[in-house]
């Protein structure tokens, strides 16, 4: 272009010049030719025009040239400007030519072509993907860092302009530095949190990498506080600082949640927005702005020494080395940051130089920041949070924990006051061991409940956690604020699936927390916490027959509830001893001082326990005082101290609750003592008694076999394995091997000793028992001064000076179960071990037949007098052959003869049943409450130690269950059956006593634990006691069955209406299901069942009066069954549907005469042992009375669950009537009632039930119920593996004994008789306290589980029998609810429709006599045959112990209120 325009002008000029020149030349030519004229004629105009044209042409050419030159220059400048950015990797869509103006302009378009930003666009919002380098305008530089400069700038987005902070990476940064730079902004780029600084964009398309952050108008918080120091005053500013602290912690928690770490957490890196919100971030200018906060290392690195956690700093060869930040170090820095915040942004350790800080803080670690100067509410707590942050790394709280604590403090600071602040604060405080605990809790199903306890939301929470001990089901009540008892010893870790821990009472909780785990024992070998309930094997959900080590462990502490549950009472008492500050080397020692000497120890310890202020019995005396210790607390303490005691005490408490507190207390204490001392003696005696052992062992073996067949028993349930496991459990639970071995002091030992003594004494008193069933206990009571003192004290507090435990207040608590001073005392063996089965009648008078002299109560002979009040027990023991006939007769007699003492005795003895089932049977009938107590204590101890050691222990649990837990089938059945049998004629509700004696839970269980002794027909009790006593007398010559008839109990039972008796047992029995799972013991016992340990089972296998036993079916169905199987199996079978249930038991028993013999023997043994007698008697009473049609309710311990259920139904039905009356006789929250160890075989097999039937006769109702619940659900669990087996419903009365038998087969004899699978079958679960334990297949923890099994067992009529059994089950199921409150309805009723379950349970129990609802509900609730008789959930749910159809789901929230509701508490599915 330049060429052409330039060239044209010259030619034109030339032409013009030529023309001009030509013209000029032409002019002269003419002149030359003509003259000069032509020259002058040349026109000047032409020349002018030529010049002008030339000029115009030149101008045009110049213009053209200039135009061409300008575009060329601009283009070059543009290229030069773009050269700086040519380094970026051109986008794929860009053309290689960067000179194109169009391409240049595309760069200004949003970063479509920029690869780096596109990587983050997906995860960022707003400007993050929109920020472009060209849209940034730098305003000024505000600082610098290792990376480069930090600039304040603006970004233009559309029509808006926003200020931003730009971090620019230096151009010379290495690739590593580039990566570090980008990663430093990643948390802020990804996180979207109001308290985390936002990175709005990254510019990485060109070399100067840029990170664009949001701008906080008020700058960093440190500068703000410095500037606003004068204004930071007053409450509003304090609240602002508190909110800022929470926001800082929240920001860090948000970062940690996504595993981001803060590189330099300090107040200088917390930025404040215009609305005073704090954002945690890092502009990277800290060092440039606050150089004094940093020190430089030898490698030219700077770090904030005063904010750095000590573990990050070290020195090597005089060189400082720093490690990378961790979450733990961030927490340390957080603490320092918060300290700054509360100290006006003062520098930490301002008085120390950097070197001093390095030495004292970092290296020495001997200095911490002082308390902040800021004055604020709970300033100490705020500082405490800071100190948490400065703990060792592994103990520091998580950022979330700090935030939770700060939030709570801030909320509390804004409130005027909160009563529960300290409590809530304690709950919120991080546990230094929480890290380990959380790691061990693999299944914190409900962990958030415990974690997020900012308010009362934690009042009722069921927490399921997997601990090293297994799956823990923890039900936390408000009262039980210590919701986590994981620190306590639990079942074996391999038992995780089945491990259940339900905690209800505060005392129990506290004790559990304070006490060593169930595996810990006092010097006496007894577990201070509720050891009786301890770790109990639960039927394996999947392979019940493998004898796996699954346990349902109700923390002994929590498992024991109010005195309502004999076990709970004992536990409470024990805990109380500790809690009361009467730290005894062994509560069991206190309770059973002579625990090593079963007989003497029983008496001595009983008296001593009563006399010792710290002893659980004295605790009860305190309970009597009721001012020093809450009844539940005491009860729980006793329970926790030792399962035996727990069983004992609750029975006493139950007595007290039932009627006269004195009598009740004494009764409970006695049962307690019995268990602790007597039960130990009993179990030892029983163990050593051939009759007991053979029958117990045989029945146990059968039960175990059945359970194994049903896969209900796990491998650990194998006889020896189970024994060892159980012994280990018991030892772990605080029961020493001595306890395990009857002579030991442990709760188990005491129980065993008591049982042993009881058995020995019954043997010595076998005649006595046979002679005076009424006087047997009385005679025992009076005859065994040694045991009598404590036992009597416990048994007949009013009588014994040591009965302060049974003070008038206590008497009030137990007024319904009030047993005069003639409370049943059991004398075990040669030395009178007063079972202390004070069968508090509805009135002591009733039990007493009016009033019992205190000494009568205290006399072990009088305790043996239980035979009078539980003649059924005596009869059962004595007349095994005539069990059926005797049972109805005895039951009738008991019913006809008002044995107010008998019911109590039954209850207590049933509680003792675990320790001395025979004694429990005798006592159960005669003194239900005492029987229950003794049974419960014995049951717990035995189940853990004694059962491991002896079959007798197994019987004790039955008794205990019957007495302890209405909810638990065993406790409900035995106690209620006894009450029913004894008090059915003289139905007396111990509802008031139930109310007086709280469940031991500080929560709503207070009402629930009321000892709701259900009156049982006196005639029945008498008959049963007499029959049992007679039978026991004859069949237990070697080991005297302790007829636990209080001095006045026996005759009192005769004199007083059965209501007393009912009161006792009901009172004793708590709404707690105690699947006492002496796996090793029962397993061992089943092996011994053939005839090894006569002692092992209260039921004497050798005894021939099964008929007598059969009569005791309802309350002592087990006992009766144990006895009945020999004589009565046929008769039982012949029985009708009610009979049928009875029959089923008998059938189970019938198949094996040995079982029958064994059953009869246990009955004898039980007759020998007050506990078994008590259990047998109440059951027998009920059974005789109610189950004349169904002879051997408890006897169905065979493998046939349906038979067992049917039998139990009949038993329950018979016992339920009185129990219905006395349903209010809330079983003292004895979840520990021995529901467990009721092997399916023992439950279903009458033959195996021989011993267990006696046990269950003791706990006929509870035991049956428990059996039902236990076997139903456990069987259902098994049944899933096998087919649907009529899951044996753990009957209250039957259960303890039956379970006991299952748990403790006699030595070789029992083992020989036990089926091969008996070990597997031996697994049982013991619930202690008002615990609603829903056992379910761990894989399917839903209600559905129970339905299948329940439906499977449709063949039971929902007749009164079914109804009765249903109430039993309800009790068992209501173990918590019923037990807690009134032993009434089930929480299920509200939560689930009872119809399906009821129909199933009805079917299940249809073949069995239905249990009477009164048993389970303090107010006689409508018969819940369906609910009570849990459907056979064999196919559906392994652990549908709760009404499978209604609530198989184990994770059900249980409330005391529900329990208090009595008949309406659905969570009666304790099992």
Swiss-Prot record:
- Annotated membrane topology: Multi-pass membrane protein
Task: List the biased-composition ranges (Acidic residues).
Answer: 1248-1265, 1378-1393
Q: Which residues carry this modification: Phosphoserine?
A: 781, 784, 797, 1076, 1274, 1276-1277, 1279, 1418, 1464-1465
- Which region ranges are annotated with the description Disordered? 510-530, 580-615, 761-814, 885-1197, 1248-1292, 1342-1434, 1452-1471
Biological process terms from the Gene Ontology for this record are:
axon guidance; early endosome to late endosome transport; endocytic recycling; nervous system development; neurotrophin TRK receptor signaling pathway; receptor recycling; transferrin transport
Modification type Phosphothreonine: residues: 783
Which key words are in the record? ATP-binding, Kinase, Membrane, Nucleotide-binding, Phosphoprotein, Serine/threonine-protein kinase, Transferase, Transmembrane, Transmembrane helix
A GO molecular function assigned to this protein is: ATP binding
Give the Cytoplasmic compartment stretches of this protein.
1-10, 63-1471
Tell me the domain of life: Eukaryota
The entry marks the following residues as binding ATP, namely 142-150, 167
Q: Where is the composition biased (Polar residues)?
A: 954-965, 1059-1070, 1132-1151, 1399-1416
Q: Known post-translational modifications?
A: Autophosphorylated. Phosphorylated.
- Which SUPFAM superfamilies does this entry report, sorted A to Z? Protein kinase-like (PK-like) (SSF56112)
* Pfam families on file: PK_Tyr_Ser-Thr (PF07714)
Ranges where the Protein kinase domain occurs? 136-406
Q: Where is the composition biased (Basic and acidic residues)?
A: 580-589, 597-608, 1115-1131
Bias type Low complexity, positions: 924-953, 1019-1035, 1168-1179, 1354-1367
Keyword Nucleus, does the record have it? no
Catalyzed chemical reaction(s): L-seryl-[protein] + ATP = O-phospho-L-seryl-[protein] + ADP + H(+); L-threonyl-[protein] + ATP = O-phospho-L-threonyl-[protein] + ADP + H(+)
Q: Explain the purpose of this protein.
A: Phosphorylates PPP1C, phosphorylase b and CFTR.
Family per record: Belongs to the protein kinase superfamily. Tyr protein kinase family.
Q: What is this protein called?
A: Serine/threonine-protein kinase LMTK2
């Amino acid at each position: 272009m330049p060429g052409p325009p330039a060239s044209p002008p010259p030619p034109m000029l030339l032409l013009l010049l030529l023309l001009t020149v030509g013209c000029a030349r032409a002019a002269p030519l003419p002149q030359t030719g003509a003259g000069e004229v032509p020259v002058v004629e040349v026109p000047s105009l032409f020349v002018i025009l030529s010049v002008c044209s030339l000029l115009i042409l030149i101008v045009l050419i110049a213009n053209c040239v200039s135009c061409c030159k300008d575009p060329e220059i601009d283009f070059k400048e543009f290229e030069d400007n773009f050269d700086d950015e040519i380094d970026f990797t051109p986008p794929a869509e860009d053309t290689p030519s960067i000179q194109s103006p169009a391409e240049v302009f595309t760069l200004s378009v949003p970063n479509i072509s920029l690869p780096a930003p596109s990587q983050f666009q997906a995860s960022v919002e707003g400007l993050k993907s929109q920020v472009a380098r060209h849209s940034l305008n730098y305003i000024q530089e505000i600082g610098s860092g290792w990376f480069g400069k930090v600039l304040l700038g603006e970004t233009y987005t559309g029509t808006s302009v926003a200020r931003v902070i730009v971090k620019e990476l230096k151009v010379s940064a290495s690739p590593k530095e580039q990566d570090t730079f980008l990663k430093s902004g990643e948390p802020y780029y990804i996180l979207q949190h109001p308290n985390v600084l936002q990175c709005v964009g990254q510019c990485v398309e060109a070399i100067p990498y840029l990170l664009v952050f949001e701008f906080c108008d008020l700058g960093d918080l440190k500068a703000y506080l410095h500037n606003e120091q004068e204004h930071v005053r007053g409450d509003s500013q304090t609240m602002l600082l508190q909110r800022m602290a929470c926001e800082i912690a929240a920001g860090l928690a948000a970062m940690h949640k996504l595993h981001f770490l803060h590189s330099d957490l300090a107040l200088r890196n917390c930025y404040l927005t215009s609305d005073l919100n704090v954002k945690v971030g890092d502009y990277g200018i800290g060092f440039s702005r606050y150089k004094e906060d940093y020190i430089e290392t030898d490698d030219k690195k700077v770090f904030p020494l005063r904010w750095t956690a000590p573990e990050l700093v070290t020195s090597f060869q005089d060189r400082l080395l720093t490690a990378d930040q961790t979450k733990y170090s961030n927490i340390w820095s957080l603490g320092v940051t918060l300290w700054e915040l509360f100290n006006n942004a003062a520098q930490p350790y301002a008085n120390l130089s950097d070197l001093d800080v390095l030495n004292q803080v970092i290296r020495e670690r001997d200095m911490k920041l002082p308390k902040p100067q800021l004055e604020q509410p709970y300033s100490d707590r705020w500082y405490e949070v800071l100190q948490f942050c400065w703990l060792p790394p592994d103990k520091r709280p998580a950022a979330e924990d700090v935030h939770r604590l700060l939030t709570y403090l801030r909320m509390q600071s804004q409130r005027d006051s909160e009563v529960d602040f300290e409590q809530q604060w304690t709950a919120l405080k991080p546990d230094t061991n929480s890290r380990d605990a959380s790691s061990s809790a693999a299944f914190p199903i409900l962990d958030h409940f415990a974690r997020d306890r900012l308010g009362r939301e934690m009042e009722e929470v069921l927490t399921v956690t997997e601990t090293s001990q297994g799956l823990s089901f923890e039900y936390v009540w408000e009262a039980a604020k210590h919701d986590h008892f994981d620190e306590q010893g639990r079942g074996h870790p391999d038992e995780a699936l089945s491990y259940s821990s339900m905690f209800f009472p505060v005392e129990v909780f506290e004790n559990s927390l304070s006490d060593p785990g169930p595996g810990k024992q006092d010097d006496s070998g007894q577990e201070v916490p509720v050891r009786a309930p301890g770790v109990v094997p639960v039927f394996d959900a999947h392979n019940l027959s493998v004898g796996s080590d699954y346990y349902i462990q109700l923390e002994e502490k929590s498992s024991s509830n109010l005195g309502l549950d004999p076990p709970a009472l004992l536990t409470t008492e024990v805990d109380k001893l500790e809690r009361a500050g009467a730290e005894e080397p062994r509560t069991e020692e206190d309770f059973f001082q002579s625990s090593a000497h079963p007989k003497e120890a029983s008496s001595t310890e009983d008296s001593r326990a009563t006399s010792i202020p710290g002893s659980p019995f004295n605790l009860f005396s305190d309970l009597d005082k009721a001012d020093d210790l809450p009844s539940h607390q005491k009860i729980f303490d006793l329970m926790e101290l030792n399962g035996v005691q727990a069983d004992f005490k609750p029975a006493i408490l139950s007595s007290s609750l039932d009627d006269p507190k004195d009598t009740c207390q004494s009764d409970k204490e006695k049962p307690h003592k019995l268990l602790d001392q007597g039960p130990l003696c009993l179990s030892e005696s029983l163990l050593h008694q051939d009759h007991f052992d053979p029958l117990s062992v045989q029945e146990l073996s059968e039960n175990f076999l059945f359970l194994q067949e049903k896969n209900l028993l796990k491998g650990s349930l194998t006889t020896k394995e189970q024994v060892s496991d159980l012994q280990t459990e018991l030892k772990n639970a605080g029961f020493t091997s001595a306890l395990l071995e009857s002579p030991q002091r442990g709760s188990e030992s005491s129980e065993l000793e008591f049982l042993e003594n009881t058995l020995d004494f019954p043997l010595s008193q076998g005649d006595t028992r046979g002679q005076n069933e009424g006087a047997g206990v009385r005679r025992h009571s009076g005859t065994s001064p040694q045991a009598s003192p404590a036992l009597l004290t416990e048994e007949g507090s009013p009588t014994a000076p040591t009965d302060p435990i049974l003070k008038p207040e206590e008497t009030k608590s137990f007024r319904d179960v009030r047993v005069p001073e003639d409370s049943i005392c059991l004398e075990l063996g040669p030395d009178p071990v007063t079972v202390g089965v004070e069968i508090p009648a509805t009135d002591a008078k009733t039990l007493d037949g009016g009033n019992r002299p205190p000494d009568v109560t205290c006399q072990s002979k009088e305790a043996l007098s239980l035979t009078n009040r539980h003649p059924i027990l005596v009869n059962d023991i004595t007349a095994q052959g005539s069990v059926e006939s005797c049972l109805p007769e005895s039951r009738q007699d008991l019913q006809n003869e008002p044995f107010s003492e008998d019911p109590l005795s039954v209850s207590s003895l049933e509680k003792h049943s675990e320790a001395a089932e025979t004694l429990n049977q005798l006592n159960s009938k005669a003194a239900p409450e005492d029987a229950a107590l003794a049974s419960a204590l014995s049951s717990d101890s035995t189940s853990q130690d004694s059962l491991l050691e002896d079959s007798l222990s197994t019987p004790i649990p039955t008794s205990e269950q019957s007495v302890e837990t209405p909810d638990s089938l065993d406790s409900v059945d035995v106690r209620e059956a006894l009450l029913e049998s004894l008090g059915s004629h003289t139905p007396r509700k111990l509802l008031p006593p139930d109310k007086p004696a709280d469940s031991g839970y500080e929560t709503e269980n207070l009402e629930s634990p009321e000892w709701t002794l259900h009156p049982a027909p006196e005639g029945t009790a008498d008959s049963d006691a007499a029959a049992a006593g007679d039978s026991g007398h004859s069949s237990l010559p070697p080991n005297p069955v302790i007829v636990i008839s209080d001095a006045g109990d026996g005759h009192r039972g005769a004199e007083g209406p059965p209501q007393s008796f009912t009161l006792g047992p009901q009172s004793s029995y708590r709404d707690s299901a105690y699947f006492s799972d002496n796996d090793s013991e029962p397993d061992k016992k089943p092996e011994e069942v053939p005839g090894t340990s006569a002692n092992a089972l209260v039921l004497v296998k050798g005894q021939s009066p099964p008929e007598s036993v059969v009569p005791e079916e309802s309350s002592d169905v087990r006992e009766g069954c144990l006895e009945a199987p020999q004589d009565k199996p046929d008769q039982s079978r012949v029985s009708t549907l009610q009979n049928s249930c009875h029959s089923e038991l008998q059938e189970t028993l019938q198949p094996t005469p040995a079982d029958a013999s064994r059953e009869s023997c246990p009955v004898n043994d039980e007759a020998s042992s007050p506990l078994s007698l008590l259990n047998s008697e109440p059951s027998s009473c009920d059974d005789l009375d109610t189950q004349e049609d169904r002879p051997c309710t408890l006897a169905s311990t065979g493998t046939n669950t349906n038979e067992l259920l049917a039998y139990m139904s009949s038993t329950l039905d018979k016992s339920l009537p009185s129990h219905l009356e006395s349903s209010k006789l809330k079983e003292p929250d004895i979840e520990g009632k021995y529901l467990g160890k009721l092997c399916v075989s023992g439950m279903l097999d009458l033959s195996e039930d021989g011993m267990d039937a006696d046990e269950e006769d003791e706990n006929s109702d509870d035991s049956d119920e428990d059996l039902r619940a236990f076997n139903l659900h456990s069987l259902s669990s098994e049944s899933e593996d096998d087919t649907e087996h009529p899951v044996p419903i753990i009957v209250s009365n039957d259960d303890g004994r039956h379970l006991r038998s299952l748990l403790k087969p006699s030595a070789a004899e029992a083992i020989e008789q036990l089926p091969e699978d008996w070990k597997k079958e031996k697994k049982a679960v013991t619930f202690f306290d008002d615990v609603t334990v829903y056992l379910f297949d761990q894989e399917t923890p839903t209600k559905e589980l129970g339905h299948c099994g329940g439906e499977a067992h449709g063949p039971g009529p929902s007749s009164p029998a079914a109804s009765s059994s249903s109430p039993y089950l309800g009790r068992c199921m209501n173990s918590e609810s019923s037990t807690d409150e009134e032993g009434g309805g089930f929480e299920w009723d509200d939560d689930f429709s009872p119809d399906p379950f009821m129909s199933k349970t009805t079917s299940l129990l249809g073949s069995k006599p239905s249990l009477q609802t009164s048993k389970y509900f303090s107010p006689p609730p409508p018969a819940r045959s369906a609910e009570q008789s849990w459907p056979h959930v064999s196919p559906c749910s392994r652990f549908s112990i709760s009404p499978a159809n209604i609530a198989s789901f184990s994770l059900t929230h249980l409330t005391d209120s529900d329990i208090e509701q009595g008949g309406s508490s659905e969570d009666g599915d304790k099992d």
